[in-house]
């Protein structure tokens, strides 16, 4: 609904938002170093842990900025068709599996396997942000009063996210060799904390400081016509940070030379793609992929459109962004609680049980949007309104994480341990795409469904003529779409849900990939 600091199961999440846990780290052997050495303490590797944390913070900045643009566009009254087009920006993190083998296999040995991609990618990101800081006001129509150039913004931020996804691949790989085997578990913590902090800086903090109303109300003694920072200021600052820190990493941080590079790593590019095709052709995997690609259609209107509708109805975008902050403790605790119920042999039962509640919350979201203009008072909203929005969002998070954790548990359960990293990443990529494409379609359909139609149904055509062809009622496509999505969702739950649950009864052999050595 509103932008969330975590990127789970969401186009912004894209969450997320990037994606639903497509991390293969810790499933692969980090190397074949000298294990005769005594274990290294966490304190001994504190500098490496802090560097990893900072790299993940940098990674979260582009994610947060991209997540803030739809809210800025909505405040400028762009069409939902334009919003749908811009939503393609959030796809690269779900598609990075397509070029991840290339990043793993092609590098300059003398410079370092991971630095060969990390350093140029972050330099390009930094230069890109600095250049974009000179153009973004024009692209948003801030300088000449024109409508935003959505096509140019989409292309720009798509490249932005593509670079961030590539940086993510490089950092994930480096994390496995930068830390010793005893401390490699901290890599996932750095990832989670760093991305969350970066997303917070690029989304929540930026939207708050960019808002003149928020700054005048909470941060200033004298009102000003603009916020403390602008998007161009923000981009220039972080572009400079990218350039400076990347230079320091390139000069001062050396990769671990003790980690040997196996022969399979230098010629694994074609082998990896062949392996992916072999996995996806298995009947059980193919059935799972088709089901999970359609499972989230019922949530698409609620997840992709509701937050934009609230902005359209007058809710300040920075207030919506700040509502994500109290959700952070819940988002940390929920997976720990839910994992107790998904640890058994049938984790998808939780997915199936949570689905109808999440669908019904979609209707509750529609009611919330309908109610919003009725409680607006003197250009603002009472505190009880925000409490209700927060409670609605919290309930939504419970159902979302129940489904998310159960899918992750199932993916981990069925993945062939011999190729666990590739297998898990493929299943999680499909799960991410299952959330991305319905969100894009849902945004695209709002405008066509929003129309003053002359009694759309042919049976009322004669009555329409008697009324002179005039339109009596304008129906917002969001409400139509919300109802349609819920019907589709319950149809999927009733007819296809049992098929998804039945996959849990497949034997281990159904999920094992036969490899040609």
Identify the function of each model-found stretch:
Residues 111-119, 208-240, 349, 444-488:
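A membrane-interface helix-boundary motif in multi-pass transporters
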Residues 89-97, 125, 185-217, 324-328, ...:
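Glycine-rich segments within core transmembrane alpha-helices of 12-TM secondary carriers
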Residues 1-43, 127, 133-154, 166-167, ...:
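Intracellular loop-helix junctions on the cytosolic face of multi-pass helical membrane proteins
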Residues 80-81, 176-191, 317-318, 386-387, ...:
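Loop-to-transmembrane helix entry/capping segments in MFS-fold secondary transporters
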Residues 118-146, 356-382:
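C-terminal ends and interior cores of transmembrane alpha-helices
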Residues 162-179, 400-422:
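Intracellular juxtamembrane helix-capping segments at the cytosolic ends
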Residues 28-93, 286-313, 320-323:
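Helix-loop boundary and gating motifs at the non-cytosolic
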Residues 95-112, 210, 331-356, 372-373, ...:
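Helix-to-loop junctions at the C-terminal end of transmembrane segments
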């Amino acid at each position: 609904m509103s932008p969330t600091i975590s990127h789970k199961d969401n186009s912004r999440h894209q969450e997320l938002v990037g994606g639903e846990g497509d991390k293969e780290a810790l499933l692969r052997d980090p190397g074949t170093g000298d294990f005769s050495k005594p274990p290294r303490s966490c304190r001994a590797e504190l500098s490496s842990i802090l560097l990893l944390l900072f790299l993940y913070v940098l990674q979260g900045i582009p994610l947060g900025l991209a997540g803030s643009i739809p809210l800025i566009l909505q405040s400028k009254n762009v069409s939902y068709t334009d919003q749908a087009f811009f939503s393609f920006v959030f796809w690269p993190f779900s598609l990075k599996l397509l070029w991840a083998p290339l990043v793993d296999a092609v590098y300059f040995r003398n410079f370092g396997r991971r630095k060969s991609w990390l350093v140029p990618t972050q330099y390009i990101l930094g230069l890109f942000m600095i250049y974009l800081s000179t153009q973004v006001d024009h692209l948003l129509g801030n300088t000449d009063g024109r409508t935003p150039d959505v096509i140019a913004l989409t292309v720009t931020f798509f490249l932005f996210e593509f670079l961030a996804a590539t940086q993510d691949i490089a950092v994930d790989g480096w994390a496995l060799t930068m830390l010793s085997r005893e401390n490699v578990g901290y890599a996932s913590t750095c990832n989670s904390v760093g991305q969350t902090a970066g997303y917070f800086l690029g989304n929540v903090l930026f939207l708050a400081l960019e808002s003149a109303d928020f700054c005048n109300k909470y941060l200033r003694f004298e009102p000003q016509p603009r916020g403390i920072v602008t998007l161009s200021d923000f981009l220039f600052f972080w572009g400079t940070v990218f350039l400076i820190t990347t230079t320091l990493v390139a000069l001062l941080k050396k990769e671990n030379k003790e980690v040997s590079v196996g022969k399979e790593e230098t010629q694994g590019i074609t082998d990896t793609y062949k392996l992916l095709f072999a996995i996806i052709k298995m009947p059980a995997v193919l059935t799972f992929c088709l089901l999970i690609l359609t499972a989230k259609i019922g949530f698409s209107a609620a997840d992709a459109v509701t937050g934009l509708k609230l902005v359209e109805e007058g809710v300040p975008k920075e207030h919506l962004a700040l509502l994500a902050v109290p959700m952070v403790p819940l988002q940390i605790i929920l997976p720990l609680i839910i994992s107790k119920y998904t640890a058994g042999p049938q984790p998808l039962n939780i997915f199936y049980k949570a689905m109808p509640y999440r669908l019904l919350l979609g209707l509750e979201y529609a009611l919330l949007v309908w109610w919003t203009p009725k409680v607006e008072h003197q250009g603002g909203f009472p505190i009880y309104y925000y409490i209700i929005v927060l409670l609605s969002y919290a309930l939504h998070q419970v159902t979302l994480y129940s489904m998310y954790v159960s899918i992750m548990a199932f993916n981990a359960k069925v993945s062939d341990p011999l190729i666990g990293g590739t297998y898990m990443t493929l299943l999680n990529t499909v799960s991410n795409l299952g959330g991305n494409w319905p969100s894009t379609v849902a945004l695209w359909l709002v405008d066509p469904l929003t129309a003053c139609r002359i009694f759309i149904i042919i049976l009322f055509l004669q009555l329409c003529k008697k009324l002179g062809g005039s339109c009596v009622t304008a129906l917002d496509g969001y409400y139509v779409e919300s109802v349609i999505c819920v019907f589709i969702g319950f149809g999927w739950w009733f007819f296809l849900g049992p098929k998804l649950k039945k996959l849990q009864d497949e034997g281990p052999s159904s999920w094992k990939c036969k490899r040609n050595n």
